[in-house]
Regions:
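A short hydrophobic beta-strand segment most commonly corresponding to one strand
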Residues: 105-107, 148-163
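A short beta-strand-loop-beta hairpin characteristic of the jelly-roll/cupin
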Residues: 86-92, 99-102, 108-127
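A short glycine-rich, His/Asp/Glu-containing loop-to-beta-strand
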Residues: 66-86
Length: 163
């Protein structure tokens, strides 16, 4: 696992941050955090999946995905999990169901008391402009947050590396 603090230069990160946290960024309701109907909900914005750009916002995130040597992108998605009373872990999962080796990267858009936990037991706190990179076949789970941040927002990238 690799952890990179201050992943993007401040000016680049701020441009993305201002748009994502602005009043007109399009978020879409998902009935479930890990699986449909799991009793929770989140808002998402799918930038890229199944070989297609799915959003006019895709190019805004170019400074993020261009930092990787990718053979192909599998999926890029933003997650927005609203604040609740207590921090709750969601189910362990892999982001993409595939037999090929792939990499997952998570860019935390804001600091809050949520985190990502791995099946290995490691726990990475959500901190603004921090990126974690790991083997996509490692199961992990995200959480809610219960601090003064009204939401936990992250960018989730899944891709095949050009090795």
């Amino acid at each position: 696992m690799e952890i990179i603090e201050n992943f993007l230069p401040e000016e680049q990160f701020k441009k993305i941050e201002d748009r994502v946290f602005g009043p007109n960024f399009p978020w879409y309701f998902q009935d479930g955090i890990v699986t449909t109907g799991d009793g929770n909900f989140k808002l998402t914005h799918l930038l890229y999946a199944h070989g297609n750009v799915n959003s006019d916002e895709f190019n805004l995130f170019r400074p993020v995905y261009e930092k990787f040597d990718m053979l192909s992108i599998l999926k890029i998605k933003l997650n927005c999990i609203p604040k609740i009373e207590t921090v709750r872990e969601n189910g362990m999962h892999k982001d993409v169901d595939t037999n090929v080796d792939f990499t997952t990267a998570i860019l935390y858009m804001n600091t809050n008391n949520g985190y990502t936990r791995f099946e290995t037991g490691e726990k990475i706190m959500s901190e603004r402009n921090k990126l974690i990179v790991f083997d996509g076949k490692i199961k992990h789970c995200g959480t809610t947050n219960s601090c003064d941040a009204h939401r936990r927002v992250l960018v989730n990238l899944n891709f095949i590396e050009d090795k």
